[in-house]
Amino acid sequence: MLMPKRTKYRKQMKGRNRGKAHRGNSIAFGDIAIKAIEHGRIDSRQIESARVAMTRHIKRAGKVWIRVFPDKPLTAKPLETRMGKGKGSVEKWVMNIKPGRIVYEMLGIEEGLAREALALSQSKLPFKTKIVTCESENEIY
């Protein structure tokens, strides 16, 4: 499960997820990748389930990079609890995703097999994504 080792503060405010990704929006390590095309929030379990689906399909060949890390705590109060009495405890760790953000990258895998593996992992993600290559990366999302 991905989460920070330690943080300065235990809980954060919700914040707003607006605009396009200015960082992490280009392929840096691999030659084919998944790029987000809408706003969303991804938690550590979704990151891991998409990674497992991808690596099982490619049978451990090549290399996969996870370009996102959940560093924002999401709190929740227990069920059937009255309002008040402070903010709830940390339930899970998430990351806000903006359009244009690269989520996963692959290298050293035949393009057809890589596209199939990335398509499997796309279904595990809670926002719309598209598969991009180094050549098609500069297209408008």
UniProtKB/Swiss-Prot annotation:
GO terms for cellular component: cytosolic large ribosomal subunit. One of its GO terms (molecular function) is tRNA binding. GO terms for biological process: translation. It holds the Pfam family Ribosomal_L16. Part of the 50S ribosomal subunit. HAMAP family: Ribosomal_uL16 (MF_01342). This is Large ribosomal subunit protein uL16. It comes from Helicobacter pylori (strain J99 / ATCC 700824) (Campylobacter pylori J99).
